[in-house]
Regions:
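Compositionally biased terminal segments of proteins
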Residues: 1-182
Length: 182
């Protein structure tokens, strides 16, 4: 198994542990969700991802602890790319916290999601994740490293939600042909 995939899953578990008190508001999306749905199936997807993506549903998000405090307490730090919602675990593996665009307050002129009292830099507003907060199921997520015994129950976006998110992502990147490879 690819070492990068093992590290990315470990970072996902680090984030789920950090955000345990926000458990009901967190949904695994992106490649990690696809891997969880496909398991060991022989499918035509790249079986390596360098990051983990988490959708945050602010409708049931507790005010305490603040997302940024929970992440920092677990050793995460903001990615220097200055993109809101971009975090790195202590090993430098990225985890992105994203809020569905229509669930973020304020105008669309900001990349950082507006979900007071949480920091505007804690999460990023993202078009296309709305379906993930509706189409998801509770799944058991385990480490891929045989020496890591952690297991978490977390919401994972369903196939329809993942497809909708991918279509939006591709549409956003039509003006950036060099970024259409994922």
């Amino acid at each position: 198994m690819d070492d990068l995939l093992i590290k990315a899953r470990s970072a996902l578990l680090d984030a789920l542990e950090a955000l345990n008190e926000q458990h009901d508001s967190i949904v695994v999306v992106g490649a990690q969700a696809i891997y969880l749905h496909s398991g060991d199936a022989d499918v035509a997807i790249a079986e390596a991802t360098k990051d983990s993506d988490l959708a945050v549903d602010p409708r049931a998000l507790p005010e305490d602890p603040l997302l940024e405090e929970a992440m920092k307490r677990a050793g995460f730090y903001p990615n220097v790319n200055k993109q809101p919602g971009a975090w790195l675990n202590p090993a430098g593996i990225p985890v992105d916290l994203m809020v569905p665009d229509t669930l973020s307050q304020g105008g669309r002129s900001h990349r950082g999601a507006r979900i007071p009292p949480h920091s505007n830099q804690a999460t990023r507003r993202t078009v296309g994740l709305e379906a993930a907060v509706v189409d998801n199921e509770l799944r058991t997520i385990s480490a891929l490293d045989p020496d890591d015994t952690r297991t978490f129950e977390a919401r994972v976006a369903g196939p329809a939600a993942l497809l909708i998110a991918k279509v939006h992502k591709i549409h956003e990147r039509l003006d950036q042909p060099d970024r259409l490879n994922d």
